[in-house]
From Swiss-Prot:
It comes from the Eukaryota. It comes from Drosophila melanogaster (Fruit fly). Expressed in neuroblasts. Its main location: nucleus. Residues 695-708, 929-939 have a biased composition (Polar residues). Residues 1-105 form the WH1 domain. Disruption phenotype: Mutant larvae exhibit hypersensitivity to the anticancer drug cisplatin. Regulatory subunit of serine/threonine-protein phosphatase 4. The probable PP4 complex Pp4-19C-PPP4R2r-flfl (PPP4C-PPP4R2-PPP4R3) is required to prevent caspase induced cell death (in vitro). May be involved in DNA damage repair. Key mediator specific for the localization of mira and associated cell fate determinants during both interphase and mitosis. This is Serine/threonine-protein phosphatase 4 regulatory subunit 3. Belongs to the SMEK family. One of its GO terms (molecular function) is protein phosphatase activator activity. Residues 940-951 have a biased composition (Basic and acidic residues).
């Protein structure tokens, strides 16, 4: 808390009208001012530092501290000032300084005694010892002196108390009333004017004991007579005539309790005095007049309610008359009016008393009685019945709900209390619709879910099953065609009330009102009212649609699109013809809400159907923004379609699968995830297409013809790719073995390297498949993984078809060399299905004569490209969201292939180029033993290469399990280990 904050104050000054004027905000300080010769309070303006206040702390000035943050004092006779502090600490600091100057204790609230307050403080001590007030003799000639004496006693509380005691003890009031009769008989106008002033001042004494005397049955009319002769009025009022003759007391059921009867009469007359005869309270606000009189009336009403509530016999008679079918309309009207006053008096009870009161009425059958009186044609009876129902519902809606639920099994649905109230609301014939508006308030309170407890679901089910049809009947009847059927003002007002209740239901009842609106197609009927000639009704229908859109419920949105419900709104906007009024602002706000909340369904629907109408509107940017947002949606969809449908020559194209939503409510979040996944997946697809294009260019038309002639294996989006891979790999392997004769002698290093890397790629794909199966068991499958399961199964089949032809060709080559190496041939046949044996056989079959070595190497390169592409795509599918793993595996396992730079590895290319030829290959005359030795060496190298490829994949997947293999010998294996 800083010093500036503590000392920040507002300065107030009291004006001539006794109102506080704000003189500015600033910071207060207490300092010695030489000019004033003392400690002064200085307030400087917060804005410019100008001096707002310079007030010397006077030793005899009364400073008062109020509410911990307010200091009030007077500068002179008629100039009051006040400082309102922002912080309590600052107020305490200034207050301590003031008390220090005046030598007072800072704990006091007032530094000096105030005259009026000092009299109050001394009143209790002086009340017994002070001399009584001597009133002049009660004579006709002394009326002026009596009036002046009473007027002079009103200045202090002590003198008021003494005067009250004198008036009460000496029966002075009755003596004055006797003089009133004398003056009235003599037509003594001056005396009557003095008596008016005397009794008006007696009311200002605010003493309940004097009220008891004046309001007694034998004196109250004389007091009213004295108050008729107001000097400011030329002719006296005739209050007594009204109370005695015009005011009629009607008893629907005779009251046998005389005390109760007297109390009712007294309360009515005193209420008349307060409301009609006495001046308005605003004139006497400073004297706090009429508070005791109001309390007198209040306690009278409480006593009346208690006495009636305790008289069970009387209440039974009242309700018997009310529910008796033979009771006349006049008597029933009087009974209802009596109950209305009874309920009005009960408003003065405490909450516990009110609860007991309404429970008593409910047990006696007040709600059953209201079912009869609400449908009466007499306006007074109906109005009083609605007032009673309003009082009950406002205090305890639970009572009415429980009663309504108990009526669910009643065969006469139309006679239910809630339906009766709705019918009376819709049938109100008054021009101002006072009854309809009052009943609308009752229905809203009953339908308010916040004040419902356990009966919420049951009552709403009851309402939407039995009552809502009655409520919306006028709307359905008036919207049969495409325009409102009845356009008179009375009907439009009633329809506006119905729309108000429906809007309330849309806002507070999510489930029930949604089902009702959608099943009955009611929203379309309501929007017919947008063509009404009454603007308030058009706004009511638009308000209902706006509340529905505010819910952002996709069920509502799809219903709006399906039924083209924006068309009436757009038509109303066009008919408004650009007039700047409430209707246009409301329509613009509706579309602005759609823009701000980014409601995609409605945005697309609006732009596709109505954007051309709003293209020329320049004074708001809402519609341009909606159009731009729509274009963004469309561009995104076009990119997705282009990705799915693109073609490149005769090569197969990978198609991304469709996106599946688990829940419509998660549309926006999953839409963004879908686009992110599509972007990553597209990169892998492009890489594959580039590789396949390079393979096609290198192999020429022969490979393409083989691809075209291969039958499809699946209807999967990826079946074209898999068939092409199988055909390319099979044909390449066959060409390699058939184009180069098998020899047991030396082999080409380039062919050996190509075969080794081809087999490593095949085993890399197998390892990727195994890794994917483990991931499926360890984690839940996301929607994208579930989508790619059929493609993964297809990959397994296609990889088997890639490996099988190669194994068959390799076995044939191995059998040709069986005479030279029976041991190697046997091992290759036994392990033809394993990755390591396939690698060994490939190495043996690759030994050929120098003339065919270049062709074999070229074809092996093509097979390697196809195998690498297969392994790359398989690892992409298997890891789904881990593209980095796929890229690393492809980089480590691919050989140097110039037609496919996206998957080549320069390091491996250099390593293969530097490999020295084996000793057996350089010998011109080698025997069977040398051939076997060469074959064994090649097999070991191939095993190492295959194992390295598998280990590299696992290492990239995050498992640090690479170790030096015992077979990893020789410069080639060591070089590959370092590269891994």
């Amino acid at each position: 808390m800083t010093t500036d904050t503590r000392r920040r104050v507002k300065l107030y000054a009291l004006n001539a009208e006794r109102q506080w004027d704000d003189r500015g905000t600033g910071h207060v300080s207490s300092t010695y001012v030489e000019r004033l010769k003392g400690i002064s309070l200085l307030v400087r303006a917060e804005s410019d530092g100008s001096l707002l206040l310079e007030s010397k702390i006077q030793p005899d000035t009364a400073y008062q501290k109020q509410q911990d943050t307010l200091i009030v004092w007077s500068e002179g006779d008629n100039f009051d000032l006040a400082l309102s502090f922002q912080e309590k600490a600052g107020c305490d600091e200034i207050w301590e300084k003031i008390c220090q100057v005046q030598g007072k204790d800072p704990s006091v609230e007032i530094t000096q005694d105030i005259v009026e307050e000092s009299e109050d403080e001394r009143f209790e001590d002086m009340s017994d010892t002070a001399p009584p007030i001597e009133l002049p003799p009660c004579e006709l000639s002394r009326l002026e002196d009596i009036s002046e004496t009473i007027q002079s006693c009103l200045s202090t509380p002590l003198r008021k108390e003494k005067l009250s005691m004198a008036l009460e003890s000496e029966s002075y009031i009755k003596k004055l009333l006797n003089l009133f009769h004398v003056c009235e008989d003599l037509d003594n106008t001056e005396g009557l004017h003095h008596l008016f002033e005397i009794f008006k001042n007696i009311f200002l004494l605010n003493k309940n004991a004097l009220f008891e005397i004046m309001f007694a049955d034998d004196t109250i009319f004389d007091v009213v007579g004295c108050l008729e002769y107001d000097p400011s009025v030329s002719q006296p009022k005739k209050h007594r005539q009204y109370l005695k003759q015009l005011a009629k007391f009607r008893e629907a059921v005779p009251i046998k309790n005389l005390d109760l009867l007297a109390k009712i009469h007294q309360t009515f007359r005193v209420q008349y005095i307060q409301d009609i005869i006495l001046p308005t309270p605003s004139v006497f606000v400073e004297d706090n007049m009429l508070n005791t009189l109001s309390s007198f009336i209040f306690f009278n009403k409480v006593e009346i309610v208690t006495m009636i509530q305790d008289d069970e016999r009387y209440l039974l008679d009242v309700f018997a008359v009310l529910t008796d079918p033979t009771t006349g309309d006049a008597k029933r009207r009087d009974t209802v009016l009596f109950l209305k006053e009874f309920c009005n008096y009960a408003q003065n009870l405490q909450p516990q008393g009110k609860d007991s009161f309404y429970k008593t009425l409910t047990c006696l059958g007040i709600l059953q009685a209201l079912e009869l009186t609400l449908v009466m044609n007499d306006k007074k009876t109906k109005s009083a019945s609605i007032d009673i129902l309003t009082a009950i519902v406002e205090f305890s809606p639970l009572v009415v709900r429980n009663y309504t639920l108990n009526q669910a099994n009643r065969p006469e649905v139309e006679r239910m209390l809630l339906n009766i109230a709705i019918e009376q609301m819709l049938n109100d014939s008054e021009p101002e619709l006072g009854i309809a508006v009052q009943l609308m308030g009752i229905v809203k309170i009953l339908l308010e879910p916040e004040n419902m407890l356990t009966e919420k679901g049951d009552f709403l089910n009851f309402f939407y099953k039995y009552s809502v049809q009655t409520l919306v009947a006028p709307v359905i009847l008036n919207t049969i065609g495409d325009r409102p059927q009845n356009e008179d003002y009375q009907t439009a007002q009633l329809l506006g009330i119905v729309l108000d209740i429906l809007s309330f239901c849309v806002e507070h009842h999510s489930y029930h009102i949604k089902n009702f609106l959608l099943q009955k197609d009611l929203l379309k009927r309501i929007l017919v009212l947008m063509k009404s000639t009454h603007t308030f009704l058009v706004l009511g229908a638009l308000r209902l649609l706006r509340k529905i859109i505010a819910l952002k419920d996709e069920f509502y949105n799809r219903h709006i699109v399906k039924c083209n419900l924006f068309a009436p709104v757009v038509d109303a906007f066009i008919r408004n013809n650009g007039r700047y009024n409430l209707l246009e602002s409301a329509i613009l706000e509706l579309f602005e809400f759609i823009k701000l909340e980014d409601i995609r369904t409605l945005c697309v629907y609006f732009v596709e159907n109505f954007s051309k109408i709003f293209d020329e509107i320049e004074y708001v940017q809402t519609f341009k923004y909606l159009k731009n947002r729509y274009d963004q949606y469309q561009d995104r969809l076009k990119d997705r379609d282009k990705m799915e449908n693109r073609t490149d020559g005769g090569l197969p194209i990978i198609r991304s699968g469709g996106r599946f939503r688990r829940d419509q409510r998660q549309m926006e979040e999953e839409e963004e995830m879908w686009f992110n996944e599509e972007d990553d997946f597209t990169e892998e697809i492009d890489t594959y297409n580039n590789v396949m294009k390079s393979v096609s260019e290198k192999n020429g038309p022969q490979t393409q013809n083989q691809q075209k002639s291969s039958p499809p294996h699946s209807t999967s989006p990826h079946s074209g790719l898999l068939g092409s891979l199988s055909t390319t790999a099979s044909s390449t392997a066959t060409s390699a073995t058939s184009g180069a004769p098998v020899a047991s002698g030396s082999s080409s290093p380039e062919a050996i390297s190509a075969d080794e890397q081809t087999q490593a790629a095949v085993h890399l794909a197998a390892a990727a498949l195994q890794h994917h199966q483990q991931q499926q068991q360890q984690q839940q499958q996301n929607p994208f993984q579930q989508q790619t399961q059929p493609e993964i199964a297809e990959l397994q089949q296609q990889l088997s078809s890639v490996e099988a032809p190669q194994s068959q060709e390799l076995e044939l080559s191995q059998s040709a060399a069986a005479s030279a190496s029976p041991t190697s041939s046997s091992s290759s046949l036994e392990a033809s299905t394993s990755s390591s044996s396939a690698s060994s056989s490939s190495s043996s079959s690759s030994s050929s004569s120098p003339p065919g070595s270049s062709a074999a190497a070229s074809l092996c390169d093509s097979a390697t490209v196809a195998a690498v592409a297969a392994s790359q795509f398989l690892s992409t599918i298997a890891t789904a969201m881990a593209a980095s793993v796929t890229a690393a595996a492809a980089t480590n396992s691919s050989p140097s292939i110039s037609p496919a730079p996206a998957v080549s590895s320069p390091d491996i290319e250099n390593a293969d180029a530097q490999l020295p030829p084996s000793d057996d290959a350089s010998s011109p005359a080698s025997g069977e033993q040398d051939a076997n030795s060469t074959e064994g060496t090649s097999s070991e190298a191939d095993k190492t290469t295959a194992k390295k490829g598998l280990v590299d994949y696992e290492s990239d997947s995050g498992e640090d399990d690479y170790e030096e293999d015992e077979y990893s010998e020789g410069p080639q294996a060591q070089k590959r280990a370092r590269q891994a």
